[in-house]
A protein has these predicted regions:
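Metallo-beta-lactamase
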Residues: 40, 127-128, 151-241
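Conserved beta-strand hairpin/beta-sheet module of binuclear metal-dependent hydrolase folds
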Residues: 1-49, 165-180
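Active-site HxH/HxHxD metal-binding segment of metal-dependent hydrolases
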Residues: 21, 42-145
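Divalent metal-coordination and catalytic microenvironments
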Residues: 8, 28, 37, 60, ...
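Short Pro/Gly-enriched beta-strand edge/turn motifs at strand-loop
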Residues: 5-13, 122-128, 148-150
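C-terminal regulatory/interaction regions
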Residues: 243-305
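Alpha-helix C-terminal capping segments
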Residues: 27-29, 36, 43-52, 67-74, ...
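Residue-level marker for buried hydrophobic side chains located in beta-strands
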Residues: 34-36, 57, 77, 174-176, ...
């Protein structure tokens, strides 16, 4: 499905739901035909001239945003400078996923693959994992990119991942916030390179833009109450943080914290969601250890100072 936002800016929605392994893409149908993210699937991309796409901007390196790159053989591909390694260094790519800590956090070796829980559709060309991509350049915070006559400003918005970017169309006041996505489950910060504090700061950065239209990677287009939606979204993580800190009034183990109702399991208690929930709890704890507000007692035991 294509949603025309005006001024040659269009949202490409996947044929199915815009959830893993899919994401929304933004298509700029101007002199330089440009795509933001490449995870909408081949069926969705059948509606645009794939051979004419000249530029692809990637919000970050996660699989559901990159698996469709091969549909666009003539495109110059750009990523944020902070995450370019994910397309070039296999070892660093896998470290950011954090699965090397699986046995430590889960108590048993990791045996299951994500694709065993979510079989990939036919229009997803590749499987999750490292794939070397020849980048045609990188962008940094506040870089201005011209897609023909359309101005796009790259916004470094870390937290979901260290190199996560949003993209702002200042002349149209349209914001693409990527995986800061207004999910009813709140932000996701379960990667090795995720950061709870950065999520809060990045959402504030987006609010300060005062956009009139908000596009996200996995939801619909929002035209109203955008500041309210962003604040409610990040408040889910803030409320979770307050629950964790209240529970640390005495020494607690990570498993004890994870046993509390912290609102992680909107997609079910799969092994992957349990693992990611523990990583996110650790992101809260790391944030407060750095602030001197939590003490690490060793063996994944923590207490509030």
């Amino acid at each position: 499905m294509i949603i025309d936002l005006g001024n040659n800016i269009k949202l490409i929605r996947p044929e199915g739901k815009a959830m893993f392994p899919y994401c929304n893409s933004v298509y700029i149908d101007d002199e330089i035909k440009t795509l933001i993210d490449a995870g909408s699937g081949g069926n969705a991309y059948a509606q645009i001239p794939k051979e004419e796409i000249g530029l692809i901007l990637l919000s970050h390196s996660h699989f559901d945003h990159t698996h469709g790159l091969d549909y666009f053989p003539r495109a110059r591909i750009m990523s944020g400078m902070e995450e370019q390694f994910a397309f070039q260094d296999e070892n660093k790519f896998y470290i950011t996923a954090g699965f090397q800590r699986w046995e430590e956090l889960m108590g048993s070796p990791k045996e299951e693959k994500m694709t065993s829980q979510t079989p990939l559709p036919d229009d997803v060309l590749v499987k999750p994992g490292f794939r070397r991509v020849e980048l045609g350049g990188v962008f940094k915070d506040h870089d201005e990119i011209m897609a023909g006559s359309i101005r796009i400003v790259a916004l470094h918005t870390p937290g979901h991942s260290a190199g996560h970017y949003g993209f702002y169309f200042p002349d149209q006041k349209i914001l693409f916030s990527g995986d800061l996505d207004i999910s009813p489950r709140g932000p996701w910060y379960g990667g090795f390179d995720s950061n709870y504090g950065d999520v809060i700061a990045s959402v504030e950065k987006l609010i300060a833009l005062k956009p009139e239209v908000l596009i996200t990677s996995h939801r619909k287009v929002f035209y109203q109450d955008i500041e309210k939606l962003l604040r409610e979204y990040v408040q889910i993580a803030i409320d979770r943080d307050e629950k964790i800190m209240a529970f640390l009034d005495q020494p607690r183990t990570l498993d004890e914290i994870a046993g509390q109702e912290l609102g992680f399991y909107g997609l079910g208690k799969t092994l992957f969601n349990i693992f990611w929930s523990k990583v996110m709890i650790l992101k809260h704890i790391e944030y407060h250890i750095q602030a001197g507000e939590v003490e690490d007692l060793g063996n994944h035991r923590y207490v509030r100072n």
